[in-house]
From Swiss-Prot:
Protein's UniProt name: 3-demethoxyubiquinol 3-hydroxylase
Gene Ontology molecular function, alphabetical: 3-demethoxyubiquinol 3-hydroxylase activity; metal ion binding
UniProt function note: Catalyzes the hydroxylation of 2-nonaprenyl-3-methyl-6-methoxy-1,4-benzoquinol during ubiquinone biosynthesis.
Family matches, as NCBIfam families: DMQ_monoox_COQ7
Cellular component GO terms, alphabetical: plasma membrane
EC numbers: 1.14.99.60
Gene that this sequence comes from: coq7
Length: 222
């Protein structure tokens, strides 16, 4: 092979197959628990061995499993939206949000480990469905694509608020993680709105809430 053809091969643009391989690799990292956080772990409060009863520990683990599933879905959703988005600025915003959600994913996974529990057994299903939903949302156009992101974050904020109310008061480590996640979600929502995201129709918002309820109810146990 000539030098010029070698340079051409090395300098070629990534094609659809490269993108597909990249998405499969990311999905495997998310589902295997191999994803690592770029920011420090928010749970810095010391935890006494007997701080939580077995019942409280199971409840905290159920809530953190729900949060972990939410982050699995966020990864897939935003990657799906970005994969089908043709507007560079919107695509970059979606990928940036997905990258920050990796921190949440890793934090929830670590807290589940500390609580002696595990992620949802249905994570491959949640990831696949959310990625497909993200691709579909992207075809609605950039304003609604970003509006979908903003509404997702708004509903996640409300869901995290509920967890802060029901987590055991003495489970400060879980509470610190959830509080930091809530702050990040608010920033993601605001970024999507500033970038041109528009409010979604009421039926769409209602359908999103219904789907979220099914996911949270199932993930608490499985």
């Amino acid at each position: 092979m000539s030098t010029s053809s070698s340079a051409s091969a090395l300098g070629r643009r990534a094609g659809p197959l490269d993108g597909l391989i990249g998405e499969i690799d990311r999905a495997l990292r998310v589902l295997s628990g191999a994803a690592t956080a770029a920011r420090p772990y928010p749970a810095q409060a010391p935890e006494a061995p007997d701080a939580l009863s077995e019942r409280e520990k199971r409840h905290a683990a159920g809530l953190m499993r729900v949060n972990h599933v939410g982050e699995v879905c966020a990864q897939a959703l935003y990657r799906g939206q970005a994969a089908a988005c043709r507007e560079p600025a919107a695509r970059a915003l979606l990928r940036e949000a997905a990258a920050e959600e990796v921190d949440h994913l890793a934090w929830c996974h670590e807290r589940l480990r500390e609580l002696g529990s595990r992620p949802s057994l249905l994570n491959p299903f949640w990831y696949t469905g959310s990625f497909a939903l993200g691709v579909l949302a992207s075809y609605a156009g950039v304003p609604r694509n970003l509006g979908f992101m903003a509404e997702t974050e708004r509903q996640v904020e409300a869901h995290l608020d509920g967890h802060l109310r029901t987590l055991p008061v003495q489970d400060q480590r879980s509470r610190d993680i959830v509080q930091k996640m809530k702050e990040d979600e608010a920033q993601h929502r605001a970024s999507a709105e500033r970038a041109g995201g528009v409010p979604l129709p009421a039926p769409v918002r209602g359908a999103m809430r219904a789907m979220s309820k099914v996911m949270t109810s199932t993930a608490y146990w499985l």
